[in-house]
């Protein structure tokens, strides 16, 4: 048989085999189009499990008359225009395959009107021929897509559809997943003219929590822990079930990457690992998690259904999620009784920063292009940026754990006021003298200077403390503990060494072990494999640091430790509270032998010269 180019109709039907698996796939693709169009109210009407009719109506921006033909064409889209756009997907859809694939296996009618048009227009396409005709229609601003007789021209595929009840259950699950990610959008779902769900638009945090309770159940919310975990451009937020209330079925796990529902093995493994010490193999965790990260760091163009993603730094993502989950599961948190939308509303304590309250869409390229960062990353290209916060825009200060709150209360207390309890972290420290020592001569933190140093006072003397030196000292103290907290790597780091580096490794292997590193040594091939590392170094470029330490051997552990700390890199601290928090954590690790070392970090300020100039 000779090689031929397939006819467009056949190519579309092949594509439909990947995109349109069942009626629920059609519903998912059409709702994502509505969301990309900026819809705030979406109606879903289903007949006979979606086999006979799927009708999606929205109040989005609509499609212009002269673009209706293109809307049904394959690889026609308004969401990307170049390879650069493909590297940074901000919308839910982007391939331009859905409508063409759906129309090739059904009778599809698309009716739409934009705000600039006085009347609506309707386009109809049917089956393999996909010939379209446009006629005037009556319709408000927005779009309605009707998909009738799905798989009417592919009997083999229609035969494999399950019962109406089963197919509708899949559709219902799709709606639930999307409704969790888009609280600001109202959804109405009917089946055979019977109202099944009505999710009202959720504006306040209380309303959004109630939507989660409505979808996941009151039992879940009453026994769930709130998680809010950040590291650089990564942000993990949502709710996780307490281990003692884990489920016997793996049926309540919702995970979203930048607002897109996904199923990813890296994420699943990190979550299971965090729960591993609490759950048996017969129990499953329940969670609703939102992961926000730079879109350049994740590839969503992996599978036609877009359920699968690929991370550029999978190990970093895994470790970040694992640490966030572990922190949530081990922290003390108060359960909040929640009532669903159908119940009488009860006053609910407002959580800190789950949702972004402003989620309107801008532009066509960015249709659903709501970016997920509260602040733009330093290495991000500003010229190509259309970043807008996804969940982080209205974040207030993250509520600290009770232990941290107690520490701050003690820090802010004077000798006469140590019985006063504080439950909240002050936002302004400009005029607060912060106690950081239990010595008779109390040392006070007064201000953060240029994000580089803390101004401290002791009696009538003033000192500067370098933030970088404090960060290094903090790590040094953690690495000198007798029981160093370690983290197992999902993917061990394999290092092939030259002869000189391997000799250096043999000389310093004990030093690495004392510092909390766990290596496997293959002397025959001069290879070492890092299996575990100190948790305090998990955000560092550890491979680079190890090689730097091996390039210059150190004979004493103290010298080794100093060299290790000198290679560390830390993000700058932007607020006074962060600096005080770091100082607090450092002081909590103090012993008598560390006092002199800490004092050596202080630079005394002599004011006489400056005061003389004022006279």
UniProtKB/Swiss-Prot annotation:
A single BP term in Gene Ontology: mismatch repair
Keyword Transmembrane helix recorded: no
Transmembrane parts of this sequence: none
Aminoacyl-tRNA synthetase among keywords: no
Record-stated family: Belongs to the DNA mismatch repair MutL/HexB family.
Known role: This protein is involved in the repair of mismatches in DNA. It is required for dam-dependent methyl-directed DNA mismatch repair. May act as a 'molecular matchmaker', a protein that promotes the formation of a stable complex between two or more DNA-binding proteins in an ATP-dependent manner without itself being part of a final effector complex.
Protein name according to UniProt: DNA mismatch repair protein MutL
Organism of this sequence: Histophilus somni (strain 2336)
């Amino acid at each position: 048989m000779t090689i031929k180019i397939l006819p467009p109709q056949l190519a579309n039907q092949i594509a439909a085999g990947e995109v349109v698996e069942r009626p629920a796939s059609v519903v998912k693709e059409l709702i994502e189009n509505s969301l990309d169009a900026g819809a705030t109210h979406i109606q879903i009407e289903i007949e006979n499990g979606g086999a006979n009719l799927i009708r999606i109506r929205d109040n989005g921006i609509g499609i212009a008359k002269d673009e209706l033909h293109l809307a049904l064409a394959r690889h026609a889209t308004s969401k990307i225009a170049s390879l650069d756009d493909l590297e940074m997907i901000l919308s839910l859809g982007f391939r331009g395959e859905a409508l063409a694939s759906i129309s090739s296996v059904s009778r599809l009618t698309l009716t739409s009107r934009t705000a600039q048009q006085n009347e609506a227009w309707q386009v109809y396409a049917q089956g393999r021929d996909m010939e379209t005709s446009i006629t005037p229609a009556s319709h408000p601003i927005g779009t309605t897509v009707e998909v009738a007789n799905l798989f009417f021209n592919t009997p083999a595929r229609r035969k494999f559809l399950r019962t109406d009840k089963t197919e509708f259950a899949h559709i219902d699950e799709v709606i639930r997943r999307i409704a969790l990610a888009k609280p600001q959008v109202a959804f109405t779902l009917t089946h055979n003219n019977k109202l099944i769900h009505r999710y009202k638009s959720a504006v306040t945090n209380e309303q959004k929590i109630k939507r989660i309770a409505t979808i996941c159940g009151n039992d879940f919310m009453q026994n769930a822990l709130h998680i809010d975990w950040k590291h650089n451009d990564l942000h993990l937020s949502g709710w996780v079930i307490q281990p003692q209330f884990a489920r016997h079925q793996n049926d309540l796990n919702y995970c979203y990457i930048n607002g897109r529902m996904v199923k990813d093995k890296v994420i699943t493994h990190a979550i299971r690992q965090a729960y591993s010490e609490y759950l048996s193999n017969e129990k499953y965790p329940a969670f609703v998690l939102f992961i926000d990260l730079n879109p350049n760091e994740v590839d969503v163009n992996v599978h036609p259904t877009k359920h699968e993603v690929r991370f550029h730094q999978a190990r970093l993502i895994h470790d970040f999620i694992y640490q966030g989950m572990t922190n949530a599961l081990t922290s003390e948190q108060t359960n909040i009784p929640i009532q669903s939308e159908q119940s009488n509303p009860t006053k609910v304590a407002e959580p800190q920063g789950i949702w972004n309250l402003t989620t309107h869409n801008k532009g066509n390229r960015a249709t659903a292009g709501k970016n997920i960062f509260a602040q733009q990353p330093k290495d991000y290209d500003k010229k190509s940026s259309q970043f807008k916060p996804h969940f982080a825009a209205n974040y207030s200060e993250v509520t600290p754990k009770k232990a941290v709150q107690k520490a701050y209360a003690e820090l802010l207390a004077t000798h006469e006021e140590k019985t006063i309890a504080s439950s909240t972290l002050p936002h302004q420290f400009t005029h607060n003298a912060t106690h950081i020592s239990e010595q008779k001569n109390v040392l006070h933190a007064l201000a953060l200077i240029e994000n580089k140093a803390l101004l401290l006072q002791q009696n009538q003397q003033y000192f500067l403390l370098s933030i970088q030196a404090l960060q290094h000292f903090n790590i040094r103290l953690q690495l000198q503990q007798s029981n160093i907290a370690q983290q197992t790597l999902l993917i061990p780091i394999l290092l092939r060494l030259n002869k000189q580096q391997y000799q250096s490794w043999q000389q310093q292997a004990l030093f690495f072990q004392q510092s909390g590193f766990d290596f496997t040594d293959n002397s025959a091939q001069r290879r070492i494999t890092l299996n575990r590392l100190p948790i305090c170094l998990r955000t560092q470029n550890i491979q680079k640091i190890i090689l730097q330490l091996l390039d210059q051997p150190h004979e004493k552990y103290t010298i080794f430790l100093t060299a290790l700390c000198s290679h560390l890199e830390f993000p700058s601290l932007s607020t006074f509270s962060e600096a005080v928090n770091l100082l607090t954590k450092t002081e909590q690790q103090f012993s008598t032998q560390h006092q002199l070392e800490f004092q050596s970090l202080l630079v005394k300020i002599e004011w006489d010269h400056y005061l003389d100039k004022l006279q």
